[in-house]
Amino acid sequence: MPAIFRSVNTDLSKVDRLLYLVNSTYFFGIGKNTIWDTSWGDEVTEENPPMTESSVVSLPDIKLYKSPIYQTLAVESQCGTVDFDSCGNSEGSKKLTLINLETTSRETLNIISPSYLYFKIEIESGDLTFANIENFRVAGLYKDTTFNNPGQIRYLPTSVVNQGTLYWASYFTPIQKNNIITTTYVQEIIIKA
């Protein structure tokens, strides 16, 4: 699951860039409710979805956009509060501590020098009902997506004014609605900045 990190103004300090990014508006897009087939590659099947390329700029057939329930900065630590086996970066397993931005001073941020953006998204069966789909096979994190009626937590693609910039993308085997009726599909995304 590659992170697709787009450029940000480099005249800003590292902490300023991270604060700009974490305070931006993000939406998690899900879609592709049709099967994976060989039109995506000779070896592609439902059980063997295509690899996500870092050059991808948009996702196919988005059916729903939903805002993250939590987004913050994170820093590597030996006593991390969150352990990610697969963070979507090439550095492998990391222990990270999530930073409470409401209680952490700017001076402390400069000292601890966070290097990660953290997002948590939850997709429930009601979200799939809202989007009128039974499953999905792609997901992506978009920055600065704009909609006709701002202020909602989820949108259909017909409400999109500007899709924004794709920062993270993943293709996978189908997530079925009947599998998330009693549980919630949770996606945690770490992007090294």
Regions found by a protein language model. Name each.
Residues 1-136, 144-193:
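Small cysteine-rich, disulfide-bonded extracellular modules of the LU/uPAR three-finger superfamily
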